[in-house]
Amino acid sequence: MALVASVRVPARVLLRAGARLPGAALGRTERAAGGGDGARRFGSQRVLVEPDAGAGVAVMKFKNPPVNSLSLEFLTELVISLEKLENDKSFRGVILTSDRPGVFSAGLDLTEMCGRSPAHYAGYWKAVQELWLRLYQSNLVLVSAINGACPAGGCLVALTCDYRILADNPRYCIGLNETQLGIIAPFWLKDTLENTIGHRAAERALQLGLLFPPAEALQVGIVDQVVPEEQVQSTALSAIAQWMAIPDHARQLTKAMMRKATASRLVTQRDADVQNFVSFISKDSIQKSLQMYLERLKEEKG
């Protein structure tokens, strides 16, 4: 049960599970261009946060080249960045977007799931679970400004948000295309998609591994707005202002009430979900399929 993309993902050597993450500490700061109230950028190797404390909003930019694949390091840095914003009471909303041209996130990093130990697979899947839970249950207003392709694990990130805005570019598709690679989305992501677009539409999308171009994405309801590419960020700022106009306590309690059942299903089954993932991804047939896919990507790149 993995969330991977059909876009090109580099086959690169990554740190082992539990290894020290270079650049994971979020101690570097610099003054943000145009940031109000003396705001300063902070970030890590793969995540840049541009805060505007005066407005109560931060923009979190993904910058894990070349395609923002969700490696173990990137997952960790995303959670740390979100936690830092949640602990700062001056921030009430976050816009999630990409610093990489043409791609929001290509999904989970296949090299984390191929040729590794069961312990590594378990650690990686726990990190995926943690990111989803932290985003899905966040008290902050989360708006995704989708300025690039958003398949598989990228769609996971977008679906956790309160509001989704997609750039009107036919190359920027969004959806959960796992079945096209012979794998499936986990139950908790299935639930999230079903909550968003309804049972029948989700059933069709998941079985066929559909990726929706902008017009279809808006029609099915997987995104809330489609706007010209140059207007994505400004539209996100306008949208987040609308959400932040609601008193926090009322909005947060309502959000928690609406999402509690879906989140609780994973919280109560986290260990079993990890075991199922490790068992599935360790199968010889799945490993061979992933290895063939990675080799094909190498050949295309070369």
Curated annotation (Swiss-Prot):
GO terms for cellular component: mitochondrial matrix; mitochondrion. The modification N6-acetyllysine is found at residues 61, 89, 283. PROSITE patterns: ENOYL_COA_HYDRATASE. The modification N6-succinyllysine is found at residues 61, 84, 283, 288. GO terms for biological process: fatty acid beta-oxidation. Residues 1-41 form a transit peptide. InterPro entries: ClpP/crotonase-like_dom_sf, Enoyl-CoA_hyd/isom_CS, Enoyl-CoA_hydra/iso. Its EC number is 5.3.3.8. It is found in: Mitochondrion matrix. Substrate binds at residues 106-110, 153, 177. Pathway: Lipid metabolism; fatty acid beta-oxidation. Expressed in liver (at protein level). Homotrimer. PANTHER family: ENOYL-COA DELTA ISOMERASE 1, MITOCHONDRIAL, ENOYL-COA HYDRATASE-RELATED. Key enzyme of fatty acid beta-oxidation. Able to isomerize both 3-cis (3Z) and 3-trans (3E) double bonds into the 2-trans (2E) form in a range of enoyl-CoA species, with a preference for (3Z)-enoyl-CoAs over (3E)-enoyl-CoAs. The catalytic efficiency of this enzyme is not affected by the fatty acyl chain length. Belongs to the enoyl-CoA hydratase/isomerase family. This is Enoyl-CoA delta isomerase 1, mitochondrial. It comes from Homo sapiens (Human).
